[in-house]
């Protein structure tokens, strides 16, 4: 993956990292390497790496234990062999309030509160030939319309990168992790893995596929990154409460930018794809989440982007507000995670200055 323009510009602020010293490690999903249902500043890291290092992380789906999958028609040979020991090996007392089995936390040794942790999504692999989708009784965006539970198994074609939803209905796959986050502030305690917040977490943002870059304000020593809730695909809204839930392995690179969250006044995560800048907002109220996402994009365009990259156009807040209204998209991310999510996508193609256009 080629780093994005802003990521390239931002690297001038990160700790000096020797290329020779960079390492790649693998973190499998086992009873001792997962955080079941929570993010926490008090969690003990299962792996510690350094700024610039890469970690390959194996993750579990939210489809449930092997017996549930078999009851829905999945052949035992199609279920990862490590899933049963995972479910049997994590005591109830060690589980948090949420339902996601997250791999991690991974500590980045240099990260401290006030820093920005940059996470580059380098690779995502589909690990099984099936996904599940389902809703519980009274769950999802229309609980009164569907007062019962329903689950289905959906075959995946990993070669064609499609899902066979039904005869005559084929869904293109765009794998991503529904949950990618760091520890929230210590005062949040053991934060439920379901609602996204200022730590990121269960953002369920389908834009965050391979090639995306996330920027988190660090709240705890080590940052404590976790990932899981693999999706083979999803529609904006995720209205029945699940996507094409599946097993993914992700390759992530971590880069620490010392003091940048303090200097930028960055309070909420933001992201980039190869084609867009992304701001996010999360709230129990959809209007509030939308206001947050729009304000975060205004702040990025008018205050943060040029400060990081002098080639970025200088925009007033008035101009940034107008640019969002005339050329950017405000999208619902999801409507089912307690806190609704909204994101603003600002296309990089808008910025046509010669120096911007010449950058990789």
For every predicted segment, state its role.
Residues 7-18:
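Bacterial N-terminal signal peptides
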Residues 62-74, 124-134, 222-232, 334-336:
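Short, Lys/Arg- and Gly-enriched loop/turn segments at beta-strand edges
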Residues 175-202, 206-284:
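Conserved mixed alpha/beta catalytic, RNA-binding, or beta-rich assembly cores of soluble enzyme
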């Amino acid at each position: 993956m080629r780093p994005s323009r802003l990521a390239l510009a931002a690297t001038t602020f990160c700790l000096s990292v020797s290329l020779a010293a960079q390492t790649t490690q693998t973190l499998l999903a086992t009873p001792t390497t997962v955080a079941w249902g929570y993010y926490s500043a008090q969690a003990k890291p299962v792996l510690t790496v350094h700024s610039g290092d890469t970690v390959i992380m194996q993750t579990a789906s939210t489809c449930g234990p092997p017996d549930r999958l078999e009851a829905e028609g999945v052949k035992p040979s199609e279920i990862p062999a490590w899933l049963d020991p995972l479910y049997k090996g994590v005591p109830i007392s060690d589980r948090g309030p949420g339902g996601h089995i997250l791999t991690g936390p991974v500590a980045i040794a240099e990260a401290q509160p006030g820093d920005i942790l940059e996470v580059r999504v380098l690779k995502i692999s589909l690990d099984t030939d099936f996904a599940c989708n389902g809703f519980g009784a009274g769950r999802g965006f229309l609980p009164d319309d569907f007062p019962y539970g329903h689950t289905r198994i959906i075959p995946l074609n990993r070669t064609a990168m499609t899902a066979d939803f039904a005869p005559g209905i084929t869904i293109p796959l765009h794998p991503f992790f529904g949950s990618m986050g760091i520890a929230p502030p210590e005062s949040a305690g053991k934060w439920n893995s379901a609602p996204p917040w200022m730590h990121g977490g269960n953002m369920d943002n389908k834009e965050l596929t391979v090639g995306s870059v996330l920027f988190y304000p660090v709240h705890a020593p080590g940052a404590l990154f976790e990932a899981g809730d693999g999706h083979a695909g999803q529609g904006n809204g995720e209205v029945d409460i699940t996507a094409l839930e599946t097993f993914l392995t992700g390759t992530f690179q971590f880069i620490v930018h010392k003091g940048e969250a303090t200097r930028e006044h960055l309070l909420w995560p933001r992201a980039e794809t190869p084609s867009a800048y992304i701001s996010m907002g999360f709230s129990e109220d959809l209007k509030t989440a939308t206001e947050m996402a729009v304000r975060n994009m205004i702040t990025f365009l008018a205050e943060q982007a040029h400060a990081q990259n002098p080639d970025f156009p200088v925009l007033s807040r008035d101009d940034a507000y107008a640019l969002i209204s005339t050329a950017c998209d405000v999208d619902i991310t999801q409507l089912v995670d307690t806190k609704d999510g909204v994101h603003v996508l600002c296309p990089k193609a808008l910025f046509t200055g010669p120096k911007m256009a010449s950058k990789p």
